């Protein structure tokens, strides 16, 4: 369990660095801003790509759960 927690923390730190670089914003201690920026990044990512099959199911699931 501890290793998965470390992995998650490392993964989130990496995503945060990437998001701060892309958005030029500092939101390391603000979960709402972080989630909004991540949602915007996902939204742009899905708009750029031509999603079919399982990717469309994933997008529909994210929209249904109000992540996008």
Curated annotation (Swiss-Prot):
Superkingdom: Viruses
Cross-referenced InterPro entries: C-protein (IPR016407)
TM spans (from-to): none
One GO BP: viral DNA genome packaging
Protein purpose: C protein is one of the proteins involved in the production and packaging of viral single-stranded DNA.
Remarks, miscellaneous: Phi KhT, a host-range mutant of phi K, can grow on E.coli C and B, besides K12, and is more thermosensitive than the parental phage phi K.
Protein known as: C protein
Source organism phylogeny: Viruses, Monodnaviria, Sangervirae, Phixviricota, Malgrandaviricetes
Gene that produces this protein: C
């Amino acid at each position: 369990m501890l290793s998965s927690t470390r992995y998650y923390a490392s993964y989130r730190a990496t995503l945060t660095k990437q998001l701060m670089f892309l958005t030029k914003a500092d939101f390391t201690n603000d979960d709402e801003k972080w989630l909004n920026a991540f949602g915007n990044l996902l939204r742009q990512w899905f708009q750029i790509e031509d999603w079919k099959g399982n990717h469309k199911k994933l997008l529909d699931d994210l929209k249904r759960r109000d992540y996008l």
